Amino acid sequence: MLDPKLFRTQLPEIAAKLAKRGFTLDVERIQQLEDTRKVVQVECENLQQERNTRSKSIGKAKAAGEDIAPLLKEVDNLKSALSEAEQKLGAVQAELDEIIAGVPNVLADEVPEGKNEDDNVEVSQWGTPREFDFEVKDHVDVGAGLKGLDFETAGKITGSRFAVMTGAVARLHRALIQFMLNTHTGEHGYDEIYVPYIVNKDSLYGTGQLPKFEEDLFKLRDDRDFYLIPTAEVPVTNMMRDEIIDEKQLPVRFACHTPCFRSEAGSYGRDTRGMIRQHQFEKVELVQFVKPGESMAALESLVGHAETILQKLSLPYRKVILCGGDTGFSSTKTYDLEVWLPSQNTYREISSCSNFGDFQARRMKARYRNAETGKPELLHTLNGSGLAIGRTLVAILENYQQADGSLAIPEVLQPFMNGQTSISAP
């Protein structure tokens, strides 16, 4: 959430910055509400003061033996008027709060202009796509040939956009999780944590999924307003909700593996084949909490940590900075890492790394105590995929496929596969 003060002091400037996203701020309505709020607030303060004055007069009149009935009537009338004014003020403030809750974060100055993913800007490339001397199969056919991927059975069990993995392919999937967690905790300084896969509405509000993106979530049929997590970002980031930590504890870095659940409500007809877009998938998430002046540098290191995984796996990829129209609701700046998929002859997203500034922290009241001033200040939050497990498996199935239908196992994963170097059809 943006600082509400900005809507009172810098409304035109905020509207101009949000336009970079293609977001139109209703400046006229906000100004109307703010003007009304000021008037009604003054009215409430005046009525409160008048009521207090009249209440004191009652005591004096009573002590002097005077008739206090007229004064009592005046106080009752003032109470009624004050109650009515307070209700009006509450309604105005509630509408303002609702509008502000639906306003996305302001973008960093360096975020490029653009409407959608076609306007994202490539920053760098790593690795050279492999040249095949045989006809390349996609991951669905490679996995089927290894008897390790079964979408038909998953469809019978649940429905579309689910997968069953078996045998060596399932072990390879597990190996990726272990490899990523070991790398991030052993080399990058993250603490591994385990969190609930079900969260409440407050948590989803804190990280920005609610109220605007409820249709993307799986809500449980329960009177407690529980949801399946769309990403570990939600429970991990909310660990700091309503907390004030000491400055000396910063930076805080968490690595967490969870399944993720998404309705893909806006993705009808897209990536219907295979594992690219699933309702349930695994991810290793990286979350950081830092001091405000350090978040942009932290974003660069966070992206580097995700890149390390791709480099160790020798998977060609590129890094792009998202344009204004493609940057997520809560983010001020986002990099995507896109891995090379030979069957599609293109790069596909495998990690998204974002700096949220104090946007999430303000919603969550996540703060640290400034060692110099002794006062609490808002943290800056960041997160990124390190990496999406399913899409990494897809990339390995395609980039490491062999002419005879077997699959070479990346060297860094072999220790997690009991030294196995390849997978062949059983």
Swiss-Prot record:
Entry keyword annotation includes Protein biosynthesis: yes
Record GO biological process: selenocysteine biosynthetic process; seryl-tRNA aminoacylation
Gene Ontology molecular function, alphabetical: ATP binding; serine-tRNA ligase activity
EC number: 6.1.1.11
Catalytic activity: tRNA(Ser) + L-serine + ATP = L-seryl-tRNA(Ser) + AMP + diphosphate + H(+); tRNA(Sec) + L-serine + ATP = L-seryl-tRNA(Sec) + AMP + diphosphate + H(+)
Main location (coarse class): cytoplasm
Entries under CDD domains matching the protein: SerRS_core
Pathway noted in the entry: Aminoacyl-tRNA biosynthesis; selenocysteinyl-tRNA(Sec) biosynthesis; L-seryl-tRNA(Sec) from L-serine and tRNA(Sec): step 1/1
GO cellular component terms attached to this protein's record: cytoplasm
Function: Catalyzes the attachment of serine to tRNA(Ser). Is also able to aminoacylate tRNA(Sec) with serine, to form the misacylated tRNA L-seryl-tRNA(Sec), which will be further converted into selenocysteinyl-tRNA(Sec).
Family: Belongs to the class-II aminoacyl-tRNA synthetase family. Type-1 seryl-tRNA synthetase subfamily.
Subunit field text: Homodimer. The tRNA molecule binds across the dimer.
Domain comment, as recorded: Consists of two distinct domains, a catalytic core and a N-terminal extension that is involved in tRNA binding.
Protein name: Serine--tRNA ligase
Species this chain originates from: Teredinibacter turnerae (strain ATCC 39867 / T7901)
Phylogenetic lineage: Bacteria, Pseudomonadati, Pseudomonadota, Gammaproteobacteria, Cellvibrionales
